[in-house]
Amino acid sequence: MFLDTTPFRADEPYDVFIAGSGPIGATFAKLCVDANLRVCMVEIGAADSFTSKPMKGDPNAPRSVQFGPGQVPIPGYHKKNEIEYQKDIDRFVNVIKGALSTCSIPTSNNHIATLDPSVVSNSLDKPFISLGKNPAQNPFVNLGAEAVTRGVGGMSTHWTCATPEFFAPADFNAPHRERPKLSTDAAEDARIWKDLYAQAKEIIGTSTTEFDHSIRHNLVLRKYNDIFQKENVIREFSPLPLACHRLTDPDYVEWHATDRILEELFTDPVKRGRFTLLTNHRCTKLVFKHYRPGEENEVDYALVEDLLPHMQNPGNPASVKKIYARSYVVACGAVATAQVLANSHIPPDDVVIPFPGGEKGSGGGERDATIPTPLMPMLGKYITEQPMTFCQVVLDSSLMEVVRNPPWPGLDWWKEKVARHVEAFPNDPIPIPFRDPEPQVTIKFTEEHPWHVQIHRDAFSYGAVAENMDTRVIVDYRFFGYTEPQEANELVFQQHYRDAYDMPQPTFKFTMSQDDRARARRMMDDMCNIALKIGGYLPGSEPQFMTPGLALHLAGTTRCGLDTQKTVGNTHCKVHNFNNLYVGGNGVIETGFAANPTLTSICYAIRASNDIIAKFGRHRG
């Protein structure tokens, strides 16, 4: 589908160049365009999910009529908004699987013993190396399920929309905090975060009330609070903050994604004139003014390749663009942002690399050599991951009587829903209406229980329910832990292996500390204890630890913070020693965290955008 933004112009530098079109890149674009800056955004993938809205000034502008006549298509729409997936959430599992590309697949130790001996096979000396297959990847230190999504909107086209705030302990100097420090002063830090979170929630549209009239949601939420209150145990169950809104037909909800953030850049003719979006364009690297470590530097231009002309005619000079801007933002996700910056350490052919090892790389033998990054020494170091436990339960039969006769006051709407359903379907063994919205319950991270909990029903790349089970009585439990940042945990990029898009192959080196492992065991115990209070395990979905990386919340790859010796950028996400280079996304978060990071990453994008606007802003009519 044609995207109606301002065409690319090579003859005039942009104010801001942005690599990446997920919610973080979109936040940069929105705020910079709102501040009268000209923005060029490139996305390696295609635009494959759309909504449409009226143009600004149209008398129907307040209405949201999807794909009405004469309306403007907006990319980056959440694919779960399709009616078929709202009616059957488990069918969305395959959409997620299709969107994800695994980052690093070990191959050196994979011998297929039963392969026909006369066919092509791998060997120890020459293992397979295509499409993420990585001979340099040690399987014992891999994040085996870490994956990326390429396309306008990024993972926001299939995410859960969970947008909790990070935990900050009362003691500013407590040994662990989810929420990073943006100031050394406790009061100022709290004020900054309060303001940023408020803005971020407005941008993405966070709510905790969209499931208030769900029977299952209220059943799970109220039952758990009653159980723990009777046991004299302090555990606070509350609605999970979600970026969504309930539609006029209460059976349906609209899940928010990048389209919400980009909307005015398509519907407002003035803003659209300052915004260019190039899809199927790979940001190959940034070219720097010089390559001398430790000295003040800046980006000269972004080297971008249009993949469509190249696909039709390899070597077509029209496929390569040099995009000049006053400031540059790389916000392609935790893996790809670091990938672009690592690849940027390999300069054009006519530039001599001044740092030792720049020609051959480091990190092992020639075959497994990695790209050195002395211009950004902390790039890829101190990465963090979320250990994750999962199970599904079938609700206790006794709870069906609670559904028929809820013991809590003020629930006439509940009783009316049940009565209508029972009357319409007297042979249904379950009194819950077919279109009753799913539960969306959370337990927040605390010092006593340092993990994030989601008790709900949603689609992931795993956890689909068998067709012969009624999903109305299935509840999912996902517990997310955290790992402490360690310098030895790192993401590096190979010199001699390439990914599917001809970029340096990522390789993980990640292990959990003893404290991390002990905490994960406690988290599993907690999940089992909580889950069994209202049901029994669904066969095949008993409690289990998930493959590392499956949470898709990798962070720390481009960490930003107050300590210049342990970070890639400052608290405004400006890369150290570069006056016009910024990073965005979950990779900037320097702390270990258990909650979903998108809202916090939007906060960083707001703060960084304000810095860009202050430095590079100028009035435009």
UniProtKB/Swiss-Prot annotation:
Residues 1-9 form a propeptide. The keyword NADP does not apply. Optimum temperature is 55 degrees Celsius. Thermostable for 2 hours up to 70 degrees Celsius. The lineage of its organism: Eukaryota, Fungi, Dikarya, Basidiomycota, Agaricomycotina. Keywords: FAD, Flavoprotein, Oxidoreductase, Periplasm. Its EC number is 1.1.3.10. Homotetramer. One of its GO terms (cellular component) is periplasmic space. This is Pyranose 2-oxidase. Optimum pH is 8.0-8.5. Active from pH 4.5 to 10. Stable from pH 4 to 11.
